[in-house]
């Protein structure tokens, strides 16, 4: 079948990496695939695209005649049968798509790549309300949050209504979707997980030998405050560094919060913390023993399953429902439950210390993590996608 992925931008980012991975997998199975992006963020991913997967760059992120005309021409010339809208919340992409496909037999799947009932804007409102001591200003912030939530809910309903299928990343998000949007019987709603995005050829080289693993804890991801809360990773390590002198913490990623985090490390007097910046995480997955993720919310947590596929035992803050689809607590990783008191660095450190001092237990957890990660392999996820497309009577 002929498939066109649509993204807001095409540069380094989780959604974009998943898009490229799925595009390459569909192409491998004989489908004709292209990617339409409203603008080019950088050329890092573009350089990794195979020649048989064209990237079409529009005229900016806008609902314009130019963009509609360009997209319609692609739909006609390339005989596109399905558009996979990877930006399944904003109004603009679905409006452009539906104007472009008017009168054509083109199906649309919209995908929401985050936790259904929250996002960065809503969390920023929550955090501002928590910090506010002024009752009047607090009331204003509450109104702002209500408006942001209402607009987000309406936008999600709109995209759902104007798509043939709407996908969320976890079965646990289905009930959240119903509650958040007010759609009681969402017959077009499908739960579809993201795949491990590391090449199968690399996957076959996974290191599972405990002798080749290092005593290293890693964080992989963006360095921001609103969502990722990486300072919690550092606070947790603060309980561990002196007790485990042969272990180290490595932070892989970059972002606007990096300077604050580096200052936090200095203030705590920590010695074995390394900031690596943006890097391909492959070598870190190969050598690390544990992964620590302390986000306030996530869509799915791709770094968790990627790490698990290399035997990296995950320790994750249970702030979002989908993590319970990935980790079986105390079997292939650990989840620190979310409570009203918030993240407890000392309790997480105790969970990690119990494993750090017992290599035999770590080894069993590591093997179990690899086994669980197979559920999210590219081939398994592709089969789920193909099944969903077949149900829509798209292609053959």
Model-flagged regions — what are they?
Residues 354, 361-375, 383, 387:
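A short, well-ordered alpha-helix in the C-terminal region of glycosyltransferases
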Residues 313-317, 322, 327:
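Short hydrophobic beta-strand element within catalytic cores of glycosyltransferases
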């Amino acid at each position: 079948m002929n498939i066109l992925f649509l993204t807001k931008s095409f540069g380094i980012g989780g959604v974009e990496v998943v898009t490229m991975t799925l595009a390459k997998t569909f192409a491998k199975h004989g489908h004709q695939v292209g990617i339409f992006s409203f603008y080019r963020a950088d050329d890092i991913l573009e350089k990794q695209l195979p020649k048989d997967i064209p990237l079409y760059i529009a005229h900016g992120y806008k609902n314009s005649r130019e963009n509609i005309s360009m997209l319609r021409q692609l739909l006609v010339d390339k005989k596109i049968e399905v558009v996979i809208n990877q930006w399944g919340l904003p109004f603009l992409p679905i409006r452009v798509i539906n104007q472009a496909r008017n009168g054509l037999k083109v199906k649309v799947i919209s995908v929401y790549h985050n936790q259904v009932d929250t996002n960065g804007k809503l969390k920023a409102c929550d955090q501002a309300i928590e910090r506010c001591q002024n009752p009047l200003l607090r009331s204003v912030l509450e109104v702002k949050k209500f408006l942001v939530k209402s607009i987000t809910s309406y936008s999600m309903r709109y995209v759902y209504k104007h798509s043939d299928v709407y996908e969320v990343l976890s079965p646990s998000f289905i009930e959240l979707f119903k509650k958040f949007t007010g759609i009681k019987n969402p017959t077009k709603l499908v739960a579809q997980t993201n795949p491990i995005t590391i090449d199968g050829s690399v996957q076959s080289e996974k290191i599972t030998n405990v002798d080749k693993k290092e005593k290293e804890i890693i964080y992989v991801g963006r360095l921001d405050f609103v969502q990722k809360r990486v300072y919690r990773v550092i606070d947790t390590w603060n309980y561990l560094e002196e007790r485990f002198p042969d272990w180290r913490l490595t932070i892989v990623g970059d972002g606007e919060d990096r300077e604050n985090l580096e200052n936090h490390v200095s203030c705590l007097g920590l010695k074995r913390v390394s900031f690596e910046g943006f890097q391909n995480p492959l070598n870190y997955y190969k050598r690390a023993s544990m992964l620590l993720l302390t986000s306030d919310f996530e869509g799915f947590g791709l770094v968790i399953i990627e790490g698990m596929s290399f035997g990296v035992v995950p320790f994750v803050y249970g702030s979002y429902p989908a993590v319970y689809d990935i980790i079986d607590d105390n079997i292939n990783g650990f989840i620190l439950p979310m409570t009203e008191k918030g993240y407890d660095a000392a309790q997480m450190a105790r969970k990690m210390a119990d494993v750090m001092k017992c290599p035999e237990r770590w080894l069993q957890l590591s093997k179990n993590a690899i086994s669980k990660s197979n559920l999210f392999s590219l081939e398994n996820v592709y089969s789920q996608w193909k099944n969903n497309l077949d149900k829509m009577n798209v292609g053959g």
